[in-house]
Amino acid sequence: MEAVMSPMMTCVHKIMCRVDQYGNIDSYDAALNVMRKRNIQITPKESVQFKSFLRMLNMADLCFEVKEEEPCCICFRKDVIYKEVPCGHYICVECYKEPIRNVCPECNAPWPERANDPTVKQYTEEQYAHTLGGYYVTRADGTNYRSQEEYLADLDNIYREVEEADQRDNDPIESDIEEEMNESEAEEEEPVPEIAQFEALNTPPPPPTNRRPKIRRPMERARNTTRYDSEELTNMLMTEVATRVSLRGGVGDLNWITQIKNDIRKIQAASYRSRNDNMMIKYFAYLVAIIMPNECEAQRREILKLHAFRCHKRNARDCCGTCGMDMCNQRTYSIREIPNNNGSRLITVCGRCNQINNVNNTAFRLLYNYM
């Protein structure tokens, strides 16, 4: 076959390169006539092979559509859509779609073979396998593709396993939530703390035990109920702060400071509802003067700056700690720390007394100015 085609390639190349010498060749028969004039003898079978040889590869991704005035170099037709092959020659679309060789008929430049690309074949067989109803398509390498029904069955199994896993994960969470709700309902049904304390005086103490008692914070009950007023909530917070300090061995934990800020916000909300601002001052004095030591001055100032008696702006009922003036209509006031035998205490000072104290340099230490 190669021996037959090799002289034909030379002849065809010469014919295509010298078309102008033989006039306008606009058909395949005209090309055969030109070959007969050049004493090129071919059989009918070789004629079919020669016609197929004049077709090129399907290389649409390597070419682009153009329109040239010259005829196709294979069929010699004009007024058709042409393609430019990688070597720079032009052929028509019809001749371009039926190739048998991977070379250019003009210059014999080799092209990469696209028909042997396994990607297109694999994609076609896989799509064909999915459209069937339970049949398999086997490739030459022995790889089998599953049908669409089996893929859907696998998806159903995966969905069922995910649902069962979620149910297993949610069971302990639901049980914990139900247990907490039962505990909250039981705590709401407990008697008032004052009555419980009075009954505890008449009840003999329990026998000693080696088991460490569980520390129950008062704030746990305060979060689950709303029957406590501002004063009672303040006392409970004081007890909780003292418990935290005793357990942690002092102040210095940022998480502890953050929790105190959250407690102060709760006291502010309770003070607004009950219109009892003295509870705020009582809690601040207890927190700053007794609980927080001197080495926590920066943290103490931070808390005072964030929460320094905002309730006075709305409905104040306090008086100045020096002159006794009612602080209800005062727009500006200050918080000062006064040293005493037990350490120090906080007082609220009106704007006039604050200015006098600043001039006289009294022992009052300014902590915060509220404008």
Curated annotation (Swiss-Prot):
Biased composition (Acidic residues): 178-192
Zinc finger (RING-type): 72-108
Keywords linked to the UniProt accession: Metal-binding, Zinc, Zinc-finger
Coiled-coil intervals: none
Disordered: annotated segments: 178-218
A GO MF term: zinc ion binding
Gene3D superfamilies linked: Zinc/RING finger domain, C3HC4 (zinc finger)
Protein name per Swiss-Prot or TrEMBL: Putative RING finger protein ORF117
Originating species: Ostreid herpesvirus 1 (isolate France) (OsHV-1)
The organism's taxonomic lineage, starting at the top: Viruses, Duplodnaviria, Heunggongvirae, Peploviricota, Herviviricetes
